[in-house]
């Protein structure tokens, strides 16, 4: 799919990630990520934030801290109107200890050496600064460049140089099951017309069924969590 090129197109895409519609096959995990990130952001002590968005071509989570931003820098390998610096995450063209917060969502699965990215993020964070991260642990392959899936123990190992690391599943195994069902059915609806019909008929039903099943189950089992959010503090 072509990347959005206008601010309006990117705003729509970012809004869909932050406040996904019921027709979105990823609705279950995206809404959980928003709640997790909002909670962590509320816990940060800084009144004003210097923010770096690694992979920030769309910047969906910028709205969560809109009233606290002092400076917001987007870095990506692709040019968009929101990107301030075109660079790889392994080589950030930024000074040491210059950011209170780094955001990096659904990027690391494409990086050959994630440890290099974490080292760079830690370098540019101020003492006491925080990283908000999201990564997949299961799901469809999204293009030929994907290399990795991540689990809690592996994430803690990669982030061992950070002082505090909290890993939270974006929903339980129940969410993982219903989200996987939704994205697989969406994949099989190959024709645009079939996908349009699916997303406006069955996809909302699968999403709502997953949310209800999650509530009934209590969300305790996380063996099939399909995505994780991470808070790491320097």
Language-model features: locations:
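S-adenosyl-L-methionine-dependent methyltransferase catalytic module, highlighting the catalytic core
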Residues: 115-116, 120, 126, 130-233
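A short beta-strand submotif of the Rossmann-like class I SAM-dependent methyltransferase core
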Residues: 104-107
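Conserved N-terminal segment of class I S-adenosyl-L-methionine
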Residues: 1-92, 101, 223-228
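Surface-exposed loop/turn positions
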Residues: 49, 96-98, 128-129
